């Protein structure tokens, strides 16, 4: 019932989004730092549930990240919950190339995208869909959550394909005011009547003609 009530809410009042669970996708090449990558995966997984996915073209990096996850889990305060989250929603994927890693990351349209490659800016140009992007080894998601400045309310579940993070714009309401002179309307008339006829809305067309035929 809670989910139904939440979905019905926008009928009466707009909300920012229905966000969660938390997500991270990490794109790394052979230069990626396994300790940093593991730390960021755990930082998302400890939300429990939270998904954490590594896409790397380097099998060696993948192996070292798996080892780092185990050693870090052993001393993590929420270790059991985090391990359960990783087992259910985590993955280490070895891709065939850096291009494939970027393509998969873009398809996932994740909430948080971390790029730990030799040239993160070059990787970034292949990405169109992500809630927030963290470039290079010294840009952990936690910095974005708490101090670096971007919104902490970000699109999840693939909605970064069409949505952005919460901003001040969510609290603003815009409108449109149109005033045309007769010559302006005449210049638009052909387009208006074509579209109106296509939709079968003849009264729309005639509302324009009434002003121009007299």
Please describe what each predicted stretch is.
Residues 64-65, 103, 122-123:
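Phosphate- and divalent-cation-binding pockets in alpha/beta enzyme and binding domains
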Residues 98, 106-214:
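C-terminal core of ALDH-fold dehydrogenases
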Residues 8, 15-20, 34-36, 44-48, ...:
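Solvent-exposed alpha-helices and their adjacent loops that cap or buttress functional pockets
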Residues 14-88, 92:
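A conserved active-site cap/scaffold subdomain adjacent to cofactor or substrate pockets
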Residues 2-9:
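Short, small-residue-biased leader/transition segments that mark boundaries at the very start
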Residues 73-114, 118-119:
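Glycine-rich, Lys/Arg-enriched anion-binding loops that position phosphate/diphosphate groups
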Residues 1, 57, 61, 163:
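Short acidic-hydrophobic sequence patches enriched in Asp/Glu that either
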